[in-house]
Design a protein with these regions (language model features):
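Hydrophobic alpha-helical
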Residues: 159-178, 243, 261-323
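Short beta-strand elements at the ligand-binding edges of bilobed clamshell
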Residues: 137, 191-213, 226-230, 258, ...
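An alpha-beta-alpha
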Residues: 106, 110, 121, 208-258, ...
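Hinge/cleft segment of the Venus flytrap/periplasmic-binding protein
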Residues: 13, 48, 52-100, 235, ...
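Hydrophobic alpha-helical segments within soluble ligand-binding/sensing domains
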Residues: 89, 145, 199-224, 238, ...
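Flexible loop/hinge segments that line or gate small-molecule binding clefts
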Residues: 167-205, 223, 318-326, 330, ...
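Bacterial lipoprotein signal-peptidase II cleavage site
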Residues: 23-35, 42-45
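Extracytoplasmic "Venus flytrap"
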Residues: 52, 56-92, 101-120, 124, ...
Length: 402
């Protein structure tokens, strides 16, 4: 089939101006709820493609335009192409090569981490000439993303790949997808209900590794605070679990308090402003997101507490974050790749072909879990090696205590 590869790949409801603002490093998300035609029927896919083609207008942006600031150099640069490997070319379903449409429901696109995930989705789709993707922007809003999933079902997409804004809030939408018989692949953060497959790195073991670096840096004694990701999201829950595991092994570390940083900078500044008044001694800040760590550092500088030597241990895995490690702003950064969308697309296509997912296993939630390999924490010893492999094309903020 000869056609433009992006003709029907649209971001619905995303303004380019919002994206350009987000690439400055102040975005809200990081990382981490109808009936439809038969999943593999040509009628359903054709109606979905037609609906996507007709969906133009105010506030919509072409995928290529949204990805103009992307950093992925090509398919071979993706870190997990050896997981569920799939040959390039048309996808066969029951001996035929029907047009297939994957619906991608993203939390939002106001952070480069989320755009990087889209890059990996698009990279896989472009390898298969009979596969298209319709991408919807949830605007970091549970109601909007719920409506997006319902929209994809109404369009008759063949499968849905979703990265939910919140683990409980998207349960009703996920239930409707499963009830409609549409394969549902969930990325990065889980939905606490049935789904075909959940794909993600272990936030527990990643946070545990970062927390171990913190315990070692503090020689097993000190007072810490924790800035979480969005409360209720599965990455925030799991990163707190990893920290708790490490603290159980380090009785000399005292947790002073914890607060919801929402993955972004501004709430972290407010939290740290308050804590610096309440606690005369803080030895380290354990943050779930780099943005939170940068925000905490700003608050420390404004409070005149730079001389306290407060240490920072964080997560996200951006090139900017790794640079902050190299320059001494952070002492460790959890290595969490957004380039997992290609795995989600491959899994969805395998499910449409009736295949089982290799290495997927039952876990403590309904459905199956494909756990991705752990990546090492980035520390001053290996930061230079990892900077070129981090996501995002933006500079870290200047160290306010330098």
């Amino acid at each position: 089939m000869d056609r433009p590869r992006h003709a029907r790949s649209l971001i619905l409801g995303v303004a380019v101006a919002l994206f350009m603002t987000a690439c400055g490093g102040t975005g809200a998300e990081q990382g981490g709820e109808t009936a439809a035609p038969e999943a593999t029927g040509a009628t359903g896919t054709e109606s979905a493609a037609a609906a996507a083609s007709e969906a133009g207008g105010e506030g919509e942006a072409d995928v290529e335009e949204l990805l103009a600031e992307g950093t992925l150099s090509g398919y071979d640069a993706l870190p997990f192409t050896d997981i569920l490997p799939m040959e390039e070319g048309p996808i066969e379903v029951e001996g035929e090569t029907p047009d297939l449409v994957i619906g991608f429901s993203q939390t939002c696109f106001n952070h480069p981490w989320r755009v990087a995930m889209l890059e990996s989705v698009q990279a896989e789709v472009e390898r298969h000439p009979n596969v298209d993707v319709v991408t919807l922007d949830g605007n970091c809003d549970i109601v909007k993303q719920t409506n997006d999933v319902d929209d994809l079902l109404a369009r008759g997409v063949d499968a849905i790949v979703m990265s939910p804004v919140e683990s409980d809030g998207l349960v009703p939408a996920a239930n409707r997808a499963v009830a409609a018989g549409v394969p549902l692949v969930v990325l990065d953060r889980d939905v606490f209900t049935d789904k075909s497959l959940f794909i993600g790195q272990s936030n527990v073991t990643m946070a545990y590794g970062v927390a171990q670096e913190m315990v070692e840096a503090l020689d097993g004694e000190g007072m810490i605070v924790e800035i979480t990701g969005l409360v209720g999201s599965s990455p925030a829950i799991d990163r707190s679990k990893g920290l708790a595991m490490a603290l159980e092994e380090a009785p000399g570390i005292e947790m002073l308090t914890t607060g919801d940083g929402e993955w972004i900078r501004e709430p972290a500044v407010a939290l740290m402003d308050d804590w610096l008044v309440r606690y005369p001694e803080i030895d380290a800040v354990f943050s779930h997101a780099e943005e939170s760590s940068w925000g905490a550092q700003l608050a420390i500088s404004r409070a005149g507490r730079c001389e306290d030597g407060i240490l920072h241990f964080t997560h996200d895995g951006s090139a900017a974050g790794f640079t902050s490690v190299s320059e001494g702003q952070f002492q460790a950064d959890g290595n969490y790749s957004p380039f997992i969308g290609d795995i989600g697309v491959r899994a969805a296509l395998m499910l449409l072909q009736g295949q089982e997912i290799p290495d997927a296993e039952p876990y403590d939630q309904p459905g199956q879990y494909l756990q991705l390999p752990d990546l090492p924490p980035v520390t001053p010893e290996n930061a230079e090696e990892w900077i070129p492999r981090g996501w995002g094309d933006f500079d870290p903020p200047a160290d306010p205590c330098a």
